[in-house]
Amino acid sequence: MMSQPAKVLLLYAHPESQDSVANRVLLKPATQLSNVTVHDLYAHYPDFFIDIPREQALLREHEVIVFQHPLYTYSCPALLKEWLDRVLSRGFASGPGGNQLAGKYWRSVITTGEPESAYRYDALNRYPMSDVLRPFELAAGMCRMHWLSPIIIYWARRQSAQELASHARAYGDWLANPLSPGGR
């Protein structure tokens, strides 16, 4: 008997989604999967007033949490930062009694405006992507979540339609069964 795929909450945070070809292409397969809930934070909270109980309920209902966003100033867009600070609160996700996310999985899916070669100690950004994403990895650890290797689409706006379609297929395949032995 085949087991059901893990329930995935895909938190999408892009303040200019209509202008992001790469992120729209990446989202397309996710919208067609029954085990994936796509939650567009900027569509739900244009005023930045986050419904914390609703967001925490969504987190409880899913086993895999995906944070898909562009890299903005070596971090995430402002609304996602606000979401992280407010929703992953002490007593819910961390600290005494904060075990609601323990054992769940965190995966960051990032698009960048620069090539991979720009993310080295001796290059433009002076740090590798693993260092840039360390705060997210630490947040996952704070929540006692499993950190899955990030998916990074470098120089997203310069990817060809074929390259983006290939990334989207691979992403969709992973989302369809994210906890399979080859998916982690």
Curated annotation (Swiss-Prot):
Reactions catalysed, semicolon-separated, are: a quinone + NADH + H(+) = a quinol + NAD(+); a quinone + NADPH + H(+) = a quinol + NADP(+)
**What membrane topology does this protein have?**
Peripheral membrane protein
Its EC number is 1.6.5.2
Major enzyme class = oxidoreductase
One CC-aspect GO term: plasma membrane
User: Main localization of the protein?
Assistant: membrane
Pfam families this protein is in? Flavodoxin_2
Q: Which domain of life is it from?
A: Bacteria
* Gene Ontology MF term list: electron transfer activity; FMN binding; NAD(P)H dehydrogenase (quinone) activity; NADH:ubiquinone reductase (non-electrogenic) activity; NADPH dehydrogenase (quinone) activity
The UniProt entry, under PANTHER family, shows: GLUTATHIONE-REGULATED POTASSIUM-EFFLUX SYSTEM ANCILLARY PROTEIN KEFG (PTHR47307:SF1)
Q: Which family does it belong to?
A: Belongs to the NAD(P)H dehydrogenase (quinone) family. KefG subfamily.
Q: Which HAMAP family match?
A: K_H_efflux_KefG
User: Whom does it interact with, and what assembly results?
Assistant: Interacts with KefB.
Q: What is this protein called?
A: Glutathione-regulated potassium-efflux system ancillary protein KefG
Could you tell me which species this protein originates from? Escherichia coli (strain K12)
